[in-house]
C-alpha cells in the first residue's frame, strides 16, 4: 500500500526540522545526526560503537522526543534472557487463560545498550525482531510498531567481558557509527550549559509517527541515475573480489547501501542521489559487513575494514 506523496518542499522542510531539533541536544555532530535520520528513513538500524559517556543514550532520547515516538531502553548484561526482550506468556488466573505480556522491544525506538555484553542467545532474540519486524509467540506472529528503529550500542572490542557480534548479525545493521568526542568549542559550551539534560527535557516533537511513515514511503522515489548505480556496485563488487578481503559485502548489504543513499539525499534536501552520498556512506554502511584476511589493527581509530573501504572509494573513478 502506497501513501500519497507530500509536496517536495514540505518533505524536505520536515526532515530539516527534525535534524535541527536533534542538534539542539547533540551539538557539533551533524554528520552522525544526518546518518541516524537517514537510517530511520531507510527503515534500517544503527550500531553505535564508542566508549562510554559520549552521548549515545542522549542521541537515542533526542530522536525519540523529536518524533513523538515511544522509547524503551534495555541494558544488555550477561544474565539477560530473550524473554526480557520480547516478553513472556503468563497464566491469568482471573481469566483462566494464558496471556502474553509484551517486552520492551514493542516500541518505536529501542536503545539496546551494550549489546555485546549479552550472550549470543539474547543478542539473537533482538536481531531476529530487527530483521523481520515481528515477534513469534506461541505460534503467533505479532507485528512490532512502525516505525521501528534499534540503536544498539557497543563498547570497543578490547573491553573485557563482551560477546562480539558475528558477521551474520552485524549485517542486520544498516550502519555502524561512532559519535566520538566533541571538539573543544562544543565541549566547552556543553560544560557551560550544565550538560544536555535540560535541552533534552525541553525538546518538543516536530514530527508524528504517521509523518515518519510517509517519509519512509517516499525514500524509494529518490532518483539515482544509472552511472551512480554502477559506481555503487563497483564499490560493492570490489569488496568481494579484492585479494585482501576474506568476506565481501552481501546482496543485502548492497540493497541497504542503495536505500541509504536515497535516504541521505532526502536528508540533504534533494530528490536525487549524488556521488558524494555514495562516498560518504561507504564506510558507515559497508565496513562492518566485510572481513579482512589480515586483522592487525592499524595506528589510530580506523579499523582495517574502514581503511580498506576508504582505499577502494579513493581508487574507483567517480562518474561525471
Where are these regions (language model features)?
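AAA+/P-loop NTPase substrate/partner-engagement loops
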Residues: 66-94
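P-loop (Walker A) phosphate-binding loop of NTP-binding proteins
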Residues: 51, 85, 153
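Walker A/P-loop
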Residues: 40-77
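Conserved alpha-helical scaffold flanking the Walker A/P-loop in AAA+ ATPase domains
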Residues: 34-38, 91-111, 140
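C-terminal engagement/docking regions of AAA+ P-loop ATPases
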Residues: 2-5, 9, 241-320
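Walker B catalytic acidic pair
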Residues: 50, 113-114, 125
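Pre-Walker A (pre-P-loop) alpha-helix and adjacent loop at the N terminus of AAA/AAA+ ATPase modules
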Residues: 9-54
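Canonical AAA+ ATPase core
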Residues: 92-97, 118, 122, 130-207, ...
Amino acid at each position: 500500500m502506497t501513501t500519497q506523496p507530500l509536496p517536495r518542499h514540505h518533505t524536505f522542510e520536515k526532515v530539516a526540522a527534525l535534524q535541527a531539533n536533534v542538534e539542539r541536544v547533540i551539538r557539533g555532530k551533524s554528520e552522525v545526526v544526518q546518518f541516524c535520520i537517514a537510517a530511520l528513513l531507510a527503515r534500517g538500524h544503527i550500531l553505535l560503537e564508542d566508549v562510554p559517556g559520549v552521548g549515545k543514550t542522549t542521541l537515542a532520547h533526542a530522536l525519540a522526543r523529536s518524533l513523538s515516538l515511544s522509547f524503551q531502553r534495555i541494558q544488555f548484561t550477561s544474565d539477560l534472557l530473550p524473554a526480557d526482550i520480547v516478553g513472556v506468556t503468563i497464566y491469568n488466573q482471573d481469566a483462566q487463560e494464558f496471556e502474553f505480556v509484551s517486552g520492551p522491544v514493542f516500541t518505536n525506538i529501542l536503545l539496546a545498550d551494550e549489546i555485546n555484553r549479552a550472550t549470543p542467545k539474547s543478542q539473537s532474540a533482538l536481531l531476529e525482531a530487527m530483521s523481520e519486524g515481528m515477534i513469534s509467540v506461541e505460534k503467533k506472529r505479532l507485528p512490532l510498531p512502525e516505525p521501528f528503529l534499534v540503536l544498539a550500542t557497543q563498547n570497543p572490542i578490547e573491553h573485557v567481558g563482551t560477546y562480539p557480534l558475528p558477521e551474520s548479525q552485524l549485517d542486520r545493521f544498516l550502519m555502524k557509527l561512532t559519535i566520538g568526542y566533541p571538539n573543544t568549542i562544543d565541549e566547552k559550551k556543553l560544560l557551560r550549559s550544565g550538560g544536555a539534560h535540560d535541552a533534552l527535557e525541553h525538546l518538543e516533537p516536530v514530527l508524528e509517527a504517521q509523518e515518519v511513515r510517509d517519509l519512509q514511503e517516499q525514500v524509494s522515489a529518490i532518483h539515482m541515475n544509472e552511472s551512480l548505480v554502477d559506481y555503487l556496485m563497483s564499490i560493492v563488487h570490489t569488496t568481494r573480489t579484492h585479494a585482501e578481503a576474506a568476506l565481501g559485502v552481501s546482496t543485502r548489504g548492497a540493497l541497504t547501501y542503495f536505500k541509504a543513499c536515497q535516504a541521505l539525499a532526502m536528508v540533504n534536501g534533494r530528490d536525487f542521489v549524488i556521488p558524494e552520498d555514495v562516498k560518504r556512506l561507504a564506510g558507515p554502511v559497508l565496513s562492518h559487513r566485510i572481513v579482512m584476511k589480515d586483522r592487525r589493527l592499524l595506528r589510530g581509530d580506523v579499523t582495517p575494514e574502514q581503511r580498506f573501504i576508504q582505499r577502494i572509494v579513493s581508487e574507483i573513478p567517480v562518474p561525471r
